Amino acid sequence: MSINRNLLNIIIILCICLNLGCNDGAQERETDSHTIQVSSLLPSSSSSCVLSPRASTTKSSLHVTHRHGTCSRLNNGKATSPDHVEILRLDQARVNSIHSKLSKKLATDHVSESKSTDLPAKDGSTLGSGNYIVTVGLGTPKNDLSLIFDTGSDLTWTQCQPCVRTCYDQKEPIFNPSKSTSYYNVSCSSAACGSLSSATGNAGSCSASNCIYGIQYGDQSFSVGFLAKEKFTLTNSDVFDGVYFGCGENNQGLFTGVAGLLGLGRDKLSFPSQTATAYNKIFSYCLPSSASYTGHLTFGSAGISRSVKFTPISTITDGTSFYGLNIVAITVGGQKLPIPSTVFSTPGALIDSGTVITRLPPKAYAALRSSFKAKMSKYPTTSGVSILDTCFDLSGFKTVTIPKVAFSFSGGAVVELGSKGIFYVFKISQVCLAFAGNSDDSNAAIFGNVQQQTLEVVYDGAGGRVGFAPNGCS
């Protein structure tokens, strides 16, 4: 009888093993990693553009295109080859500028009050590589213009005729305010002109009683011109009269191709603040993982996924353009990294649409790099590039198994990164971990746009929170 009972126990155990898996290590490797085709890491060679269904069907939604992709109006259906080293250089310039602005180390000298073309003082505003673009209608009649959208900037601006000193090369016709019946300049005695200090870091000045703005970016790009009000058209049903924007008559720098910038920051002159009665300071986006696909930028709460998990906006960025986050943990391959809570809580963190590579405090990055390399030990390493020091040569492999990486934020939001949110690919023989360490423990962490790809990212300015959900572009 005991033999039969023992046999029965063995059978039960075998059944459990077959159904649930008795090899914990094997199960952990399967569920805590991505196995993908190496070729899928490369940019698509397709010359066609796949439109995001979200942007095509959701109210108040715009298509988001990659600056170098086939979907961009700027490229006439042909992808352009980005200079990755230059992108990373500009990215570091942006990060340096963000950190300087947060630590209040940059000078905030005023724009000279003599001429509208005077170069403003360096103010700590941020540009970077400006990877993602939307098309917005400006004026009456409407002029469709391609603008970089940026959660780290407040003032929306575009190049305007006449170019008093210089304008950079722009693919679309430069906006001519004299041909718009809805354009008018703003007085230098207005409250909006007085708000320029907080929106741009430079006080407004006067030219024949008209308000002059000036903004200079961390890479020495700049725009100077008239603060004005104009009609903005997002969609046929989303039209706003009297939106404050900068009409730049002296513009220079690395904006080449685009008309200007759409400011999505937190200041009262930002686009979300100016349209708050319509959208309640809510907008969301999904950044496409491929340059041959579009994502979306949607204003208001329409179409936001019920699966979005929110985290409170932290106080670290109060008084700035930025949206702060509280990172509480990072996991690699299902294992929580041994990072003391003070590593993140002391400098704080923020999310930024314009920073490419996620930056972490030195101790946090060291823990991430060490764990990731250990789990990728079967793949040969190769030399790093610029700010990226952990790279792999995958040229001898058809598939690659990548440990999953997830970020946990206060409030219970957990963001698991897709495979394209983990790597920055130069070529198959040089596939790099898309994270970098800050130069100092006091510098804030920045959740960059490589890690945001394909996520639905929701900014609820009125509710003081940021949310995340997977599969945001579909």
From Swiss-Prot:
The enzyme's E.C. designation: 3.4.23.-
Gene Ontology MF term list: aspartic-type endopeptidase activity
Disulfide linkage: 391-432
Lipid bilayer topology: Lipid-anchor; GPI-anchor
Top-level class of the enzyme under EC nomenclature: hydrolase
Annotated Peptidase A1 domain residues: 132-469
Propeptide stretches in the record: 444-474
Keywords, sorted A to Z: Aspartyl protease, Cell membrane, Disulfide bond, Glycoprotein, GPI-anchor, Hydrolase, Lipoprotein, Membrane, Protease, Signal
Chief subcellular location: membrane
Signal sequence segment: 1-25
Gene3D superfamilies found in the cross-reference section: Acid Proteases
A single Gene Ontology CC term: side of membrane
Induction line: Up-regulated in AED1 mutants.
Subcellular location per the Swiss-Prot or TrEMBL entry: Cell membrane
Keyword Mitochondrion: no
Keyword Glycoprotein: yes
Lipid group attachment sites (GPI-anchor amidated asparagine): 443
GO biological process: proteolysis
Domain of life of the source: Eukaryota
Active site (UniProt): 150, 352
PANTHER family reported for this sequence: ASPARTYL PROTEASE AED1 (PTHR13683:SF750), ASPARTYL PROTEASES (PTHR13683)
Its job: Probably not redundant with AED1 and not involved in restriction of salicylic acid (SA) or systemic acquired resistance (SAR) signaling.
Family: Belongs to the peptidase A1 family.
Name of protein: Aspartyl protease family protein At5g10770
The organism of origin for this protein: Arabidopsis thaliana (Mouse-ear cress)
Lineage: Eukaryota, Viridiplantae, Streptophyta, Embryophyta, Tracheophyta
